[in-house]
Amino acid sequence: MTSATDKSIDRLVVNAKTRRRNSSVGKIDLGDTVPGFAAMPESAASKNEAKKRMKALTGDSKKDSDLLWKVWFSYREMNYRHSWLTPFFILVCVYSAYFLSGNRTESNPLHMFVAISYQVDGTDSYAKGIKDLSFVFFYMIFFTFLREFLMDVVIRPFTVYLNVTSEHRQKRMLEQMYAIFYCGVSGPFGLYIMYHSDLWLFKTKPMYRTYPDITNPFLFKIFYLGQAAFWAQQACVLVLQLEKPRKDYKELVFHHIVTLLLIWSSYVFHFTKMGLAIYITMDVSDFFLSLSKTLNYLNSVFTPFVFGLFVFFWIYLRHVVNIRILWSVLTEFRHEGNYVLNFATQQYKCWISLPIVFVLIAALQLVNLYWLFLILRILYRLIWQGIQKDERSDSDSDESAENEESKEKCE
């Protein structure tokens, strides 16, 4: 069994030392992927701070206060090396307090953080309210833990097993393999919810026919708020600018702003069916993007094939489906379901919301079109020139970064 596994891995992997230097499918940085803390490059300042902490830890303790400082520095050093520790402690404390209390109802103050709120009595449907923000905030912490833990404890050892020796390339793989995991779960989850709704295969008329969708089923609400937490957590990392900005940093920021506005407005103003479809288009296409990049890092012979699949799903989901949704806003928005402004009954599908919905989705489409142009350029070079180069990423310096890394090791 072990030899069979090794042979299958050998088909995917060629030693990193013999990897072709002109390939950069793995360097395509599209708008939905933001690096985790584990994949951040270590700056000179952070290295100096680490040296100071280690020096403080090795010094003699003359007073009790020195011992306390050592404990604090020890924790900081551990947290710096394993950034999932702090969110892990927070999650353990909250979950333990919640489950040990024996009160799993909404009367428990911790319920709004751990579980979704506003269940409609006697049904599987849930309304919306301010407590949903607490759920999103708590699961932002959860996704911070999940991302850093998987990268540090699961994915990094796997990259070492695959003989990825370059630290720079290893960090790139951490990002993409986590994206494969997340999108590999969220994409099918979203499709499952869509299959059990009237939206299957991205039908547009049901998006408006049952409006307003003031309540949502259990799984639907978990998926929607979970996605909101995931995107909000990514936005926080992006705002902190913990890594060198990519060439398309402005487009990346714009993409996240538009996405967060779409998430908030679609949830508050009851356009969640439309939001579900857009979530799925992004997750499924991102899965194939990250898969093609990971295979490219491994110098796999399957890279061109998977990259071709990625291009197909990107065009179909992010352009064909999204443009169909845009067209439905112009043609079906007014005629399917109620079309009236009534604050008392939470009816917001009216002449005011129509242009807002259209502009937000169109803005997202413009960013995707810009990225499509760059993707097609890469595809053209891959087919006609055998070069897989991406000018829009921050990876112009990828090889130089690896060279600098080699020099540091030699020194």
From Swiss-Prot:
Keywords: Endoplasmic reticulum, Glycoprotein, Lipid biosynthesis, Lipid metabolism, Membrane, Phosphoprotein, Transferase, Transmembrane, Transmembrane helix. It is found in: Endoplasmic reticulum membrane. GO terms for biological process: ceramide biosynthetic process. It comes from the Eukaryota. InterPro entries: Lag1/Lac1-like, TLC-dom. Its EC number is 2.3.1.24. The modification Phosphoserine is found at residues 23-24. It is a multi-pass membrane protein. Pfam families: TRAM_LAG1_CLN8 (PF03798). One of its GO terms (molecular function) is sphingosine N-acyltransferase activity. The chain crosses the membrane at residues 82-102, 135-155, 177-197, 212-232, 252-272, 297-317, 356-376. Residues 1-81, 156-176, 233-251, 318-355 are cytoplasmic. Glycans are attached at residue 103. It is an enzyme of class 2 (transferase). Residues 103-134, 198-211, 273-296, 377-411 are lumenal. It catalyses: a fatty acyl-CoA + sphing-4-enine = an N-acylsphing-4-enine + CoA + H(+). Residues 168-384 form the TLC domain. SMART domains: TLC. Component of the ceramide synthase complex required for C26-CoA-dependent ceramide synthesis. Redundant to LAC1. Facilitates ER-to-Golgi transport of GPI-anchored proteins. Involved in the aging process. Belongs to the sphingosine N-acyltransferase family. This is Sphingosine N-acyltransferase LAG1. The gene is LAG1.
